């Protein structure tokens, strides 16, 4: 943070070539390049969106060429999702600092043609990831700036009116939210890094009702996850303030049975080469599993590619703290 070291890399599946700092190469006249702290990435239509948290903006570029098209100014922006011609960006709203009086966060609606902000709705404290199911958006609120008074809710936004209609109590310090192909939501809690551990929660609709409720608590730590078919691949880098150390784990959960079916998706022992897992994605066609390694947080990281059976295929040096992956459709 504070060093404008956000970069964009590009891997070409056809040639096997990996290009570091792709954005700077394609946009040599952009001052300070991408900016400070890249926090999310997404593709919608022909455009690529990069959420740059501490530069308070979303950079927009052509998804195939990487040429810059413009930017959207949003304070302390976090994550981006897309729906019916609009981009939705979660925002902490307030400045980047721990503050027990930090304001509630918001979700901004952006026109993907003009890049104009069209609507805004207030949600919980320090909102993170979002998902949309049946014309409702679900937003994980962390309250991370208000430690130890974390938020514990998922905000529900009705997309037609763009109003918050409910807050679902789930767990403290929420972060990730992903939907599976059965429209269940998988939500992570980071816990309090002391006595309350990270957990994974399942939200589903009650029979005959249109409201989501917490149906299951999966007793695993989960920092991030990727879902393909009926398999949820996850890793955990669980920090403990008492021991000043991380506990790292990997696994696979069957989203239908909600059972842990494997304690690691890496099967050849090469997980020992990963220092700090920091991002995960599964290729939608090949099933290849990608894991990023942040290493020491200050120098180049590594991107690992594993087969769908968990065997290492290759690895490559990346920019600093690699974290977010998106696949460009053919």
Can you describe what each PLM-predicted range is?
Residues 1-330:
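Predominantly soluble domains enriched in secretory-pathway, periplasmic, or organellar proteins
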């Amino acid at each position: 943070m504070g060093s404008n070291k956000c970069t964009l890399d590009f891997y070409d599946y056809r040639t096997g070539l990996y290009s570091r700092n792709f954005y700077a190469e394609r946009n040599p006249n952009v001052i300070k390049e991408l900016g400070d702290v890249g926090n999310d990435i997404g593709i919608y239509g022909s455009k690529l969106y990069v959420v740059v948290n501490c530069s308070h903006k979303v950079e927009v570029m052509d998804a195939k060429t990487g040429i810059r098209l413009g930017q959207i100014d949003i304070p302390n922006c976090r994550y981006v999702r897309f729906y019916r011609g609009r981009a939705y960006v979660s925002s902490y709203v307030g400045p980047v600092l721990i503050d027990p009086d930090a304001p509630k966060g918001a979700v901004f609606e952006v026109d993907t043609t003009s890049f104009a902000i069209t609507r805004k709705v207030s949600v919980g404290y320090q909102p993170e990831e979002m998902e949309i199911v049946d014309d409702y958006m679900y937003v994980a609120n962390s309250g991370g700036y208000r430690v130890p008074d974390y938020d514990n809710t998922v905000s529900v936004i009705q997309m037609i009116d763009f109003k918050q209609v409910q807050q679902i109590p789930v767990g403290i310090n929420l972060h990730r939210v992903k939907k599976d192909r059965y429209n269940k939501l998988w939500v992570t809690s980071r816990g309090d890094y002391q006595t309350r551990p990270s957990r994974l929660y399942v939200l589903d609709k009650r029979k005959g009702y249109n409201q989501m409720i917490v149906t299951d608590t999966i007793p695993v730590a989960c920092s991030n996850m990727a879902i393909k078919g009926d398999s949820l691949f996850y890793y955990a880098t669980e920090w403990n303030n008492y021991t000043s150390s991380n506990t790292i784990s990997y696994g696979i959960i069957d989203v239908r049975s909600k059972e842990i079916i494997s304690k690691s998706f890496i099967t050849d022992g090469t997980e020992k080469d990963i220092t700090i897992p920091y991002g995960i994605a599964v290729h939608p066609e090949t099933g290849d599993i990608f894991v990023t390694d942040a290493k020491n947080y200050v120098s180049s990281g590594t991107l690992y590619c594993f087969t769908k059976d968990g065997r290492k295929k290759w690895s490559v040096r990346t920019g600093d703290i690699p974290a977010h992956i998106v696949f460009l459709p053919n």
